[in-house]
Amino acid sequence: MARTEYSNKLTGDNIARAKANELGCSPKHAVEIAHLVRNMMADDAVAYLEQVIDLKRAVPFHRFNRNVSHQKSLNGKTFGTAAGRYPVKAAAEYVRLIRSAQKNAEYAGLAPEKMVIIHAAANKGRCIKGIFPRAMGRATPKHKDSVNVEIILREVQ
């Protein structure tokens, strides 16, 4: 695993950060969730993502929305699009990461309930290569993508 740095170099007394490398979820789903949780309060983001895990609310898909069906839980006025899905694995990883950033904020002496997500980014991680045996002695490549996710929280007054 390669050591990676934060893409945003924000520092300060009211900043808390968390990062996870090479997660086993879809990079496209991670990008869409990062777009969703950016500028949300941390507790609100966790509550929304827990509803996504329970398949109650959908994540709006803005970028990777080709052939994505419209969801009743999304109205076009709130998010600007009605296309969405329920990325359960990526949502669970984001919940774990946001809670980790809140614990880092608590350790730094900040109030975790007053934290807002000012930066959320998802980048492609390492591709784990594999092969899938086929008939007649052939083989098909079977690659598994990973994703690097980072969250930065700031305390609001």
From Swiss-Prot:
Entries under SUPFAM superfamilies matching the protein: Ribosomal protein L22
GO-annotated cellular components: cytosolic large ribosomal subunit
The organism's place on the tree of life at top rank: Archaea
Coiled-coil blocks: none
Family note: Belongs to the universal ribosomal protein uL22 family.
N-terminal signal peptide: none
Keyword rRNA-binding in record: yes
Residue pairs linked by disulfide bridges in the UniProt entry: none
Record key words, sorted: Ribonucleoprotein, Ribosomal protein, RNA-binding, rRNA-binding
NCBIfam families: PRK04223.1, uL22_arch_euk
GO function term, MF aspect, one: rRNA binding
UniProt-recorded name of the protein: Large ribosomal subunit protein uL22
Record function comment: This protein binds specifically to 23S rRNA. It makes multiple contacts with different domains of the 23S rRNA in the assembled 50S subunit and ribosome. The globular domain of the protein is located near the polypeptide exit tunnel on the outside of the subunit, while an extended beta-hairpin is found that lines the wall of the exit tunnel in the center of the 70S ribosome.
BP-aspect Gene Ontology terms: cytoplasmic translation
InterPro entries on file: Ribosomal_uL22, Ribosomal_uL22_CS, Ribosomal_uL22_euk/arc, Ribosomal_uL22_sf
Keyword Transmembrane: no
Assembly with partners or alone: Part of the 50S ribosomal subunit.
